[in-house]
Amino acid sequence: MHISVVGLSHRTAPVEIRERLSIPEQTMETSLQSLRGNEQVLEASILSTCNRLEIYTLVRNPDLGVSAVSDFLSSHSGLETGELTPHLFSYHHEDAVDHLMRVAAGLDSLVLGEGQILSQVKKMMRLGQEHKSLGPILNRLLTQAVTTGKRVRSETNLGTGAVSISSAAVELAQLKLGQSRGLDHLVTLESEQIAVVGAGRMSRLLLQHLQAKGASGVVLLNRTVERAEQLSADFPDLPVQCRPLTDLDQYLSTCSLMFTSTAADDPIIDAARLAPLNRRSKLRLIDIGVPRNIAADAADVNGVESHDVDDLQEVVARNQEARQAMAREAEQLLQQEAQQFLEWWDSLEAVPTINQLRSSMESIRTEELQKALSRMGPDFSARERKVVEALSKGIINKILHTPVTQLRAPQTRQDRQQALRIVERLFDLEAS
């Protein structure tokens, strides 16, 4: 069995490719069932975010497993395999484990050290458990990854002032506003007329960072006003006006800055919608949705400046050097957690031999116990029989304790295999 990961991210694919592979939560069960339906895939889990899609699997054969996952991605996205392959990466065994640890720690994120990815890894594990696509191996791996993410954020400086896609989006707005005034620094958003489209987790973070950056008020548009009102109630110090999404055109006409973060499958804003508005002032659109909420042609409309998640690189580059130094603190911790999982994984190789050894000893114990009890005659009480049986079990457990502990102990694969072969020969066990 082999652990593998196949995926793509902001490092390997542009947003127009990533959005076609995005897997929303409502189709996660079907996707996991499709993967598990392949005979090569024993366990599966999917991580789908705005910046990455990664499929972790336990497979019989790594090459055939990668092929199975690639075929699934091609079918899901409608992209030919040849068109998709240049954007995919794959890692196996130790490399796959190391990669997941880095992802959970935020070291592979667009915004280095961002905190939201850990919640997304937790969600990946929860959905895998709910839809019964996880087995003991991936469940243990994901648990270890969550532990890693928590330790990095609590034990290193990378967790200090951690940022997110939403905070980077707000910072991008500040940067672009400053550049429009001939300034090379971030400016306050106090005078901007701001709208946020969507009322999910990303929008919650947007409101949080807009408030911190001086926004004087925000219009929150959502399909259901009730959900927007529930969200706005968590920000009593930020004036939030909740409106239905049907009012979108009105605010496209009047606001100066709009953020979009909805779960829509198709763009909700495009050139055809913007062109008739005849705006006289600049409209800045910042889209952090994947799939994109704003079509690429929106930027072709006069007076409209449009940005998507790939444009956040400009903001990230401004503080990446400092966060890289913090990331180096986390590397040793990551290696510890990865090694701990790999030692557990390698120890599983000994389980069949240990089970055979226990079974063999139990057969001998039972056989010899029956011989002894038959010699005791009818005067041997039931209580005395139980004492003798417990004694025989205790002796076997004491004898097996040290060899079983040694077989499970951390060691090189070569040393473990040599020890297993010796035990199998000494006790006439079948080779595992």
From Swiss-Prot:
<dbReference type="Pfam" id="PF00745">
    <property type="entry name" value="GlutR_dimer"/>
</dbReference>
<keyword id="KW-0521">NADP</keyword>
<dbReference type="InterPro" id="IPR015895">
    <property type="entry name" value="4pyrrol_synth_GluRdtase_N"/>
</dbReference>
<dbReference type="GO" id="GO:0050661">
    <property type="term" value="F:NADP binding"/>
</dbReference>
<comment type="subunit">
    <text>Homodimer.</text>
</comment>
<dbReference type="GO" id="GO:0008883">
    <property type="term" value="F:glutamyl-tRNA reductase activity"/>
</dbReference>
<dbReference type="Pfam" id="PF05201">
    <property type="entry name" value="GlutR_N"/>
</dbReference>
<comment type="pathway">
    <text>Porphyrin-containing compound metabolism; chlorophyll biosynthesis.</text>
</comment>
<dbReference type="InterPro" id="IPR018214">
    <property type="entry name" value="GluRdtase_CS"/>
</dbReference>
<dbReference type="InterPro" id="IPR000343">
    <property type="entry name" value="4pyrrol_synth_GluRdtase"/>
</dbReference>
<keyword id="KW-0627">Porphyrin biosynthesis</keyword>
<feature type="binding site">
    <location>
        <begin position="114"/>
        <end position="116"/>
    </location>
    <ligand>
        <name>substrate</name>
    </ligand>
</feature>
<keyword id="KW-0560">Oxidoreductase</keyword>
<feature type="binding site">
    <location>
        <position position="109"/>
    </location>
    <ligand>
        <name>substrate</name>
    </ligand>
</feature>
<dbReference type="GO" id="GO:0015995">
    <property type="term" value="P:chlorophyll biosynthetic process"/>
</dbReference>
<dbReference type="InterPro" id="IPR036343">
    <property type="entry name" value="GluRdtase_N_sf"/>
</dbReference>
<dbReference type="InterPro" id="IPR036291">
    <property type="entry name" value="NAD(P)-bd_dom_sf"/>
</dbReference>
<feature type="binding site">
    <location>
        <begin position="198"/>
        <end position="203"/>
    </location>
    <ligand>
        <name>NADP(+)</name>
    </ligand>
</feature>
<keyword id="KW-0149">Chlorophyll biosynthesis</keyword>
<feature type="active site" description="Nucleophile">
    <location>
        <position position="50"/>
    </location>
</feature>
<dbReference type="Pfam" id="PF01488">
    <property type="entry name" value="Shikimate_DH"/>
</dbReference>
<dbReference type="InterPro" id="IPR006151">
    <property type="entry name" value="Shikm_DH/Glu-tRNA_Rdtase"/>
</dbReference>
<comment type="similarity">
    <text>Belongs to the glutamyl-tRNA reductase family.</text>
</comment>
<comment type="function">
    <text>Catalyzes the NADPH-dependent reduction of glutamyl-tRNA(Glu) to glutamate 1-semialdehyde (GSA).</text>
</comment>
<dbReference type="InterPro" id="IPR036453">
    <property type="entry name" value="GluRdtase_dimer_dom_sf"/>
</dbReference>
<comment type="pathway">
    <text>Porphyrin-containing compound metabolism; protoporphyrin-IX biosynthesis; 5-aminolevulinate from L-glutamyl-tRNA(Glu): step 1/2.</text>
</comment>
<protein>
    <recommendedName>
        <fullName>Glutamyl-tRNA reductase</fullName>
        <ecNumber>1.2.1.70</ecNumber>
    </recommendedName>
</protein>
<feature type="binding site">
    <location>
        <position position="120"/>
    </location>
    <ligand>
        <name>substrate</name>
    </ligand>
</feature>
<feature type="binding site">
    <location>
        <begin position="49"/>
        <end position="52"/>
    </location>
    <ligand>
        <name>substrate</name>
    </ligand>
</feature>
<dbReference type="GO" id="GO:0006782">
    <property type="term" value="P:protoporphyrinogen IX biosynthetic process"/>
</dbReference>
<feature type="site" description="Important for activity">
    <location>
        <position position="99"/>
    </location>
</feature>
<dbReference type="InterPro" id="IPR015896">
    <property type="entry name" value="4pyrrol_synth_GluRdtase_dimer"/>
</dbReference>
